[in-house]
Amino acid sequence: VEREAEKLLGLGEDEVFVCSTGVIGQRLPVDKVLQGIREIIPAKLAKENGSEAAYAIMTTDTVRKECAYELQLSTGTVKIGAMAKGSGMIHPNMATMLVYVTTDAKADPADLQKMLSAAVDKSFNMCTVDGDTSTNDSIFLLANGASGVEIKTEEDKKAMADLCLLYTSDA
């Protein structure tokens, strides 16, 4: 699945990741997934279709969970977007929640991982919806550095972490 998406998008190997939730042990219908990828990439994939992506990942969710922010850091402004799925089996530690955060900030991957882990511990990992747990959860923070604005100071890191908390309360 990843290789087909990478090929259609013109990306290199290991630049696409696949996530899923569902019945544990039940295999995904790979042929249907591949058919969907082949249909959606040329027809709908565009910067303007973020809301459609947030809608597409919904399963039992009743509303789209998405947000976009501009955040002032010590050296400039960055954009941050997020979308998530998950409405049940969220207790504790995210459970079946899948979260995707993107930013145009520039940062060292190790620093981003530390910042994200600390932020998740104080936000997403404290969510409880129904008391049910699951084995499927993920949060991804993708930073392309396009703004050239670097996450440098402790205040910058705190501001980024605070957004995770804000998103958790909004979602």
Region spans (language model):
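Short, contiguous, pocket-lining structural segments
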Residues: 88-93, 111, 130-134, 138, ...
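A conserved active-site cap/scaffold subdomain adjacent to cofactor or substrate pockets
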Residues: 144-163
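Conserved small/polar residues in nucleotide/adenosyl-binding loops
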Residues: 167-171
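Hydrophobic alpha-helical transmembrane segments of multi-pass inner membrane proteins, especially
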Residues: 122-126
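Glycine-rich, mobile lid/loop segments that gate access to catalytic sites or pores
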Residues: 4-121
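Short, surface-exposed loop/turn segments at secondary-structure boundaries that line and modulate
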Residues: 14-35, 128-150
